[in-house]
Amino acid sequence: MKKSLLVLTTLALGISLAACGKNDNSNNASNNGASSSAPASAAISGAFSAAGSTALQPLVDQASKKFMDLNKDVTITVNGGGSGAGLSQVAEGTVQIGNSDVFAEEKLKDADADKAKELVDHQVAVVSIAAVSNKDVGVDNLTKAQLVDIFTGKVTNWKDVGGKDQKIVLVNRPASSGTRATFENFALGAKSEDLPDSITEDASGTVRKLVSETPGAIGYLALSYLDDTIQALKYEGVEATAENVASGTYPVWAYEHMYTKGEPDGALKAFLDYMLSDEIQGTDVKDLGYIPVSDMKVTRDVEGNVTNK
């Protein structure tokens, strides 16, 4: 009797241990399966802000809304203000992402040079800038020399560059604008002038509206803001298209940077990874008029030097 009881007890103990072992292994497999098949959004939460480049803003706006739809516990606030403002704010820690059309080293110099060293660059796209005019100026192409003369005030009438007998109205951007820096560096090769009768406006949407509604107006915009209310001007006979930018034929372009102060983690890292995902790069980037960095056949360094890949 005692022997039978001992056998039954031992058998029950063995079954119990086996069951425990089976449950442990099953849980591990389930957890591994969940981490590989469940969406990454399951554990993502947090809130952060991005500010800066208005040229990049349409892409960040659209991507952030899609990301928040996928991750209900994440809140992202996106503002403009210009590249200079975005870089200053992320360096100061008032926002978590500083959007910029220029390298941080270009804007944060001299006394702020150490701040630039703390920032981590995430290049999410390429933006191209085109000179744009009111549709009735009678010109569809300008040379580099003509653009320089217009934006430095040497030429003030469209007839002097082959257009109508009409006063040229400049719509420029503030000095802090990354769009202005890109246009000056790669279209003009010189600084534009803040002339007394010119208009200065940082918001790209407002620039487009002003150019479309002001007779004789000229300005410049990222391709993502082009529409049929304005005219995009050819540069030295070359159109600002994604193909011409990618090949290096059209020179007025820059990387779109999303800077963080140090390496990102948590929801911030997840969002930046999402910006570089096929979902955003393969659809939103192209649909909004940007060029994926991977499509570029040339590269450009912080000094502006272009080399073939």
Where does each model-flagged region fall?
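A composition-driven surface/loop motif
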Residues: 11-13
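C-terminal motif of bacterial Sec signal peptides marking the signal peptidase cleavage site
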Residues: 15-19
